[in-house]
Amino acid sequence: MPGSALLCCLLLLTGMRISRGQYSREDNNCTHFPVGQSHMLLELRTAFSQVKTFFQTKDQLDNILLTDSLMQDFKGYLGCQALSEMIQFYLVEVMPQAEKHGPEIKEHLNSLGEKLKTLRMRLRRCHRFLPCENKSKAVEQVKSDFNKLQDQGVYKAMNEFDIFINCIEAYMMIKMKS
């Protein structure tokens, strides 16, 4: 009896090691990431659609906050930093101000923020998507323009969130090819 119990324990431990090894290898090489990418972007777009009309009607300005130079940074060598900084910008500066516009907006923005945090976490786990240190001048310009717009900045930034999602998608597509 003790021999068969020992054998069962050894088999159990071996099975646990194998399953742990497979999980960590899969996590490290990011083989699962491409499959979930389009789903994550769809979730972001769906969550944004819950507040898009509200912010579009409040955005009375003709200027564009998220310009082509930002998209160029996303597509260039600063893509990683631009993405990281823009996620942080929306989570720390834009969304907290946007949440002040009522409990129904706050609820949807919380959901949108959680989805953005999940995306950032997944990108960080897969180092080829977010291995960066340099600063993006385009992101600095977005932040500067946002601050100059004062109270209107939140409407402009949230109204253009779909442009930000498109930038994320362009960046991830480039990284998938490399």
UniProtKB/Swiss-Prot annotation:
Gene3D superfamilies recorded: 1.20.1250.10
GO biological process per UniProt: branching involved in labyrinthine layer morphogenesis; cellular response to estradiol stimulus; cellular response to hepatocyte growth factor stimulus; cellular response to lipopolysaccharide; chronic inflammatory response to antigenic stimulus; defense response to bacterium; defense response to protozoan; interleukin-10-mediated signaling pathway
Disulfide linkage: 30-126, 80-132
Broad class of the protein's primary localization: secreted
Record-level GO cellular component terms: extracellular space
Signal peptide: 1-18
InterPro entries according to UniProt: 4_helix_cytokine-like_core, IL-10, IL-10/19/20/24/26, IL-10_CS
Subcellular location field: Secreted
Keyword Signal: yes
Entry keyword Glycoprotein: yes
Family recorded in the similarity comment: Belongs to the IL-10 family.
Quaternary context: Homodimer. Interacts with IL10RA and IL10RB.
Function in brief: Major immune regulatory cytokine that acts on many cells of the immune system where it has profound anti-inflammatory functions, limiting excessive tissue disruption caused by inflammation. Mechanistically, IL10 binds to its heterotetrameric receptor comprising IL10RA and IL10RB leading to JAK1 and STAT2-mediated phosphorylation of STAT3. In turn, STAT3 translocates to the nucleus where it drives expression of anti-inflammatory mediators.
Protein name, entry field: Interleukin-10
The gene coding this protein: Il10
